[in-house]
């Protein structure tokens, strides 16, 4: 009986090792330049955030465009999105990532990782942006061209109240940041 269990366990392991994981098929898109993106936050800790696109010319909504274009899920809690120079920057809070996507094809062109819990991104130039985070007394400095963190600004007196994190440059004890 014991050897039968071992054989069954070994068989299950072998079968699982041979499985091919299907993440879905990638679709091709060519969106107009006048559409509207909708971040669907999803349920906290369920990894079911999605991105939708509304085309005002055809009056249609395309749901789950990130998944359909990239054959992978967006992640856990899509917090916000900013568009700069035909690149959409989708901030996914609980997945600790900011995805850069082409706004016409919805394909991922890059990502910024290793963030604590990002909420919003604000661009200063093509090579510098600030990222606010919840539960972190720092504003991260990132290089959008290289998709990397280049530094951070400590804000030691900043409280963990979410309204402070929701507005870049609105903290009354600190002057505007000029770097």
Spell out what each predicted region is.
Residues 1-16:
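Sec-dependent bacterial lipoprotein signal peptides
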Residues 18-179:
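Predominantly soluble domains enriched in secretory-pathway, periplasmic, or organellar proteins
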């Amino acid at each position: 009986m014991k050897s039968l269990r071992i054989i069954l366990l070994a068989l299950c392991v072998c079968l699982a090792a041979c499985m091919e994981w299907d993440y879905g098929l990638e679709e091709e898109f060519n969106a107009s330049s006048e559409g509207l993106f909708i971040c669907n936050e999803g349920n906290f800790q369920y990894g079911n955030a999605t991105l939708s696109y509304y085309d005002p010319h055809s009056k249609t909504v395309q749901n789950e465009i990130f998944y359909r274009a990239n054959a992978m899920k967006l992640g856990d809690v899509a917090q916000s999105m900013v568009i700069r120079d035909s690149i959409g920057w989708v901030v996914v809070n609980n997945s600790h990532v900011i995805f850069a996507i082409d706004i016409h094809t919805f394909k991922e062109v890059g990502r910024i990782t290793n963030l604590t819990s990002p909420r919003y991104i604000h661009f200063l130039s093509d090579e510098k942006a600030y990222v606010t985070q919840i539960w972190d007394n720092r504003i991260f400095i990132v290089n959008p061209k290289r998709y990397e963190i280049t530094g951070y600004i400590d804000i030691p007196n900043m409280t963990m109240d979410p309204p402070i994190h929701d507005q870049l440059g609105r903290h009354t004890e600190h002057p505007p940041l000029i770097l």
